[in-house]
Each structure stands twice: as C-alpha cells, then as structure tokens.
Amino acid sequence: MRYWAWRVQAEDPLPPPDIQIFALYHDSAGEHALPDSVGLSTGLMVLAHVYADRAAQGENNVVLAHELLHTLGASDKYDAGTGQPRAPDGLGEPLRQPRYPQNIGEIMAGRIALGPEEATMPASLQEMRVGAITADEIGWR
C-alpha cells in the first residue's frame, strides 16, 4: 500500500498531502461484510472500504473519519471481539442516565450503543462525536 501511495503521489503535480486517504468502493448489492479499513499513523495514509451507493454516504463518511483519526493517533473504542462500543470510552454520552440507549456515538467506536450488547451504524457524522479520550489522543485537549 505504501508503494502504491508513493506512486500516486509521485505522479501528482500538486504539493504532497499531509495525509493520503484512499476509498475503495464496493458493490452494495447483497449482504456481505466489507474487508477491514485501515488507518496508519506511520505513513499517514488510510485505505477505507466503503459502499458505492448514495444511500451509504453517511456511513461511508463515518468510516472515513474513523480511519482518518487513526492516522492522528486515535485508538479504537470498541471491543475487537464483538464490535460493540466499550463503555464508557466508546459512548457518545458516557454520563447519560440511564446509560442506554445512546442517542449519539463516539467516532472511534464506530457505532451507536443501544444496549450493552446491541449497537447500530450511524446514518451520518451528525450522529457521532469525538469523545474526551479521543480528543486527548489526537491533541485536541
């Protein structure tokens, strides 16, 4: 991937970017999971697997933003085994009482927690927030 990114950059007459983001679009027909997207802090590049469907634009933007924040040093806020947002760091409203359902998600959790074992994909970035720990990791606080 780094070689390919270098080749793309070498042929580009514009000044080199700080971060390179590549979106690989997949057919949205059928029920299939996409390969994992990757954001690399070394090399500052993103390879995001997203759906080629206007209806998926909001979800695609969440994936792109999530991976972009990895390049800046943010860590995942979800359980790697289940994909569930980790409480409280992976919750958009960590102090909410009752805790569930959450109305918004933490961008590095990638989903909105509806319960301890249930989550949904956000429809857009407007349903996500950068939590305190993520803000610290990327130097916003």
Give the positions of each predicted feature.
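Glycine-centered secondary-structure boundary/capping sites
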Residues: A10-P16, G73, R96, P101
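Surface-exposed patches in mature extracellular/periplasmic domains of secreted proteins
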Residues: R7-Q9, Y78-T82
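Metalloprotease/metallohydrolase-associated module, dominated by Zn2+-dependent proteases
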Residues: S37-T42, V46, V50-A55, G83-R141
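Active-site recognition of the HExxH zinc-binding catalytic motif
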Residues: N61-K77
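Short loop/turn segments at secondary-structure transitions that flank enzyme active sites
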Residues: D27, R54, S75-Y78, L114
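Metzincin-family zinc-dependent endopeptidase catalytic domain
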Residues: M1-V62
